[in-house]
C-alpha cells in the first residue's frame, strides 16, 4: 500500500508538471483565431480516474485571468485517493480525447497521455499533442491555495522549457529508481529523474525543427521558486511562485506568500549561445494581498477573543505556527509582502534561522519559518468582554517585558513563547501584555508584583500607561516573609489574593486588612462573587456573576479555568482577624483557635467531628475593617450557606444510620432454624417467632422445656415440617404423622425458602422440602461441591448405625423390618472408628457448656425426621446448609457437617433427625437413658431414639 501511495503521488506530481508545462508553454496561437489567446478550461468529469477518457472542449469568451477559479474546481489533487488505483496494473494509460462539439468556432484538441510503469521500476509518461498547432491552450492545475496569476499572451516564439521547484518534495519518499517520461518522436519529452542526494529533476526537451537548446524543469524538494529561461530575443516575462499542495503535509498559501515568496536565479546546463537568463517575480494580484491580509487579520481577531495554549506541533509537518500578530505586525507583513513581490528584486529574502536569537529579529517572524515547534491553540470557543483579569501594558523598558497582571502560570517544559522572548513587539496590541517575564527561549519566569527580577538590569519599575490601569493599586501584605499573600485590585472583580501557587478572588467585605493597609486599596467596587473551598468543598456563588464558566477562562491563556483550590490553612490565613502593620497577631487569636473554633467568612464557628455550629460573636471585631455595601452581607450569606451545609451533612448521617437499622424483608435463617441468632437486635433480618422450626423432641413427646424456655416452636405446622420420605415411597402408615405428606416430582428443585427455615406456600409448594442433597444421596458425589446448600450425609455411617439391635420405625413393625432389611450391615474400619470417637468427643465437649456459638454448629448436624431407620432412604437430612448466610458460623457448620468427620457429630446426637434441637446441657446425657425407653415407645407407635455406638 505504501508503494501504491508513492506511485500515486508521483503520478499526480507529473501530471501537474505536464499541465503547468502546457499552461506556460502551450503551442503557438493559430493564425486568425481570435479565441486562441484565451483560456480554454477543461471540462473534467466529476470522478476522474486513471484510464478514463475525457474531453477538454474549449469555452467561448473565457479570458486568461479567470484561471484560478476553474483550477480550484477542477484540481487534480482535490480528488480522493481511492478514486484511482493505478499501481495495480504495471502498464496503464490515461487518454484525453475531445468529443465532437456543436460549435464550429472554438478550437478543440485531442491530448493523448500515457502513463506506464516499466519493469525496471521507471515511470514513463507519454503525451501526444494535437496535430494542429493552435488547438492547445493548456491550462494548469491549481493545488491547495495556489495564488491567482495572470498569464501573459505569448506573442513571439514560445519558450522551450522552464525550471520549476515545487515544495513538498521532501515529504514524498524518494524512489531508488529513476522515473523517466518518454514521448513520441514529435512530442516534447518530459524526463523525471530522481537521484539520491539531488533534487528531483523533470527535464522538458522539445523536439522542434529549429536548433534551440533544450531546457529543463526542476522539481526541488527544498524551496519554492520558478526559474524561466528564455532565449535572448524574448522579452522579460514574469514567473509565478507556485505553492503546490502535495500530499497531506502541505503548506498553505499564506506560508508561501508571506514567508517564502522569492525568486531564485538558478544555474542551467545550457550552451553559451542561449543568452542571458532572466528571472523576475510576477507581481501579486490584489486577490493575493487581500487573502493574505484577511487570513492574518482573522487570526488576530480570533486570538483576541479566545484563550490560547501551547500545543506541540509535529516536527515533520511544516504547518503554520498559529501565532497572532499585532495590528502593526500585520500591517508590516502585508506591506512587505506586497512590496517584495511587486519590486523586481532578484536577490531572495534572508531565511529565518530557528537558532537565531529573537532579540536580533528586527522584522516580524515569518509564519512559514517559525522557530518554534509549538503553536497556539484556542482552548475556549466562547469569549466574554467582561473579564476577571486584564492585560496590562508596562512601559518604561526597551524590551517591553510581557506581564500578565495577577495570575501565575505553570508552563510546560520546553515550551516556547508565542511572541518570542523579551524584545519583540507587544503581542496583543498597544495595551495588552502578559504577566510573565520571558527570560530565555525555554523558560518563562513569573514576575512578582512590580518588582523586577534580580539580575535583570534592563528592567525598570513599570508604570501604568493606560487609563484603565489607574485603578490598579497593588500593595504587598506584610504577613509572612516570602509566601505572604498579595492583595491586588482589578477593575471589575474586587481584590485578588495572589500567593505562590494560587489566585483567590475575594469580595471586598471579606478581606481582612488592617486600617492602614485598607486605606491604600481602592474599595469603591462592590463584590461580585466569592469562592470558598474548605474541607467539604463548600462553594458559594452570588447570582450576579459566575466565577467559573463565562468570565474567568476568557482571559486566562494557558491554565485550566476551574474552581481555585484552597486548603484549610490558606482559608484560615486569609480569613483570620486582621494583622497589624507590625506583623503581630491580636492576643485573642490563640485563645479561640485552640478551643476548636474556626473563623470562616468573618464568622466564628465551633467545629466538632461532624458538626459546624455558629457562635454569636465575632473575634477581634475592633481590628477588622468590614466593608459593607448596599447588597446582602457576603459574610452572613456565607455563614448561612455553611450552616445549611453542615445541617444537610448531619441529616445525611442520620438517614444512613436509619437505613442500616431498617429490617430487610427477609427472615433470618438462623433464627428460623435454631430459634436464636447470635446477632440479636443487630441482625438486619426479621426475627419472627411464628417462623421458628418445630421442636422435634416436642413432636416425639420428649422435650422437657415445656415452660416456654425451649427456643424452638412447640406449634406443629405443616409448612415447617419436611416431606415424609415414607410417604414418598408409599409406605407411611402413620395416620398422625407430623411430617408433610405432599407428593412432589423427583425432578423438582429443592425449595430455597424451606432451606431458610420457612416456606410460606406450605403444602402448595411444588418444590422439595428436604435438607438432604439428592445427588449426593444417589451418587455419593455432588457437582456443586462445598457450595451446595444441602446436607451431604455419608450412607456408610447410616448403615452402620441402623445395625443397632433395636431398630425402630416411624409407624409400626412392618416398615421397621423393611427399613432394617434394606440396609446393608457393614463393619466400619479402624480409621472410621477413630475419627468418629474424636468427632464425638469434640461435639460433646462443645455442647457441654451449652454456649450459644457452638450450639448451632452441633444442631446443624441434626436431622428433621423422628425415625432413625428412615435415614438410609434419604427422608429429610440434617439442616446444615452452606448458603451465604448473615453469620459465619453457618459456613463453619457446613464445613463441619459436609465432610465425613464433621457429620460424625450425629453419632453423639442420633436421637432425632430434625431441623433443630434445643441446646440443653443434658442433651448429651439424654441419649443414654433414651435407650431403655425404646420398648415403651415401640408399642405406642412413636419413634424411638437410637443408642450411639461408641
UniProtKB/Swiss-Prot annotation:
Pfam families: zf-CCCH
Biased composition regions of type Low complexity, renumbered to the chain: 370-388, 839-849, 857-888
Keyword Zinc-finger attached: yes
Residues recorded as bearing Phosphoserine in the entry: 405, 851, 855, 918, 920, 934
PROSITE patterns: ZF_C3H1
GO molecular function terms listed in the Swiss-Prot or TrEMBL record: DNA binding; R-SMAD binding; SMAD binding; zinc ion binding
A GO BP entry: positive regulation of activin receptor signaling pathway
GO cellular component: mRNA cleavage and polyadenylation specificity factor complex; nucleus
Biased composition (Basic and acidic residues): 344-360
Zinc finger (C3H1-type): 662-690, 694-717, 718-744, 745-772, 773-795
InterPro entries to which the protein is assigned, alphabetical: Znf_CCCH (IPR000571), Znf_CCCH_sf (IPR036855)
Biased composition range(s): Polar residues: 76-96, 327-338, 402-412, 460-470, 828-838, 914-928
Coiled-coil boundaries: none
Superkingdom per UniProt: Eukaryota
Spans annotated as Disordered: 32-106, 127-182, 201-220, 314-489, 793-950
Listed SUPFAM superfamilies: CCCH zinc finger
Subcellular localization(s) per the UniProt record: Nucleus
Complexes and interactors: Interacts with SMAD1, SMAD3, SMAD4, CPSF2 and CPSF3.
Function: Required for the export of polyadenylated mRNAs from the nucleus. Enhances ACVR1B-induced SMAD-dependent transcription. Binds to single-stranded DNA but not to double-stranded DNA in vitro. Involved in RNA cleavage.
Protein name: Zinc finger CCCH domain-containing protein 3
Source organism of this protein record: Mus musculus
Lineage, uppermost ranks: Eukaryota, Metazoa, Chordata, Craniata, Vertebrata
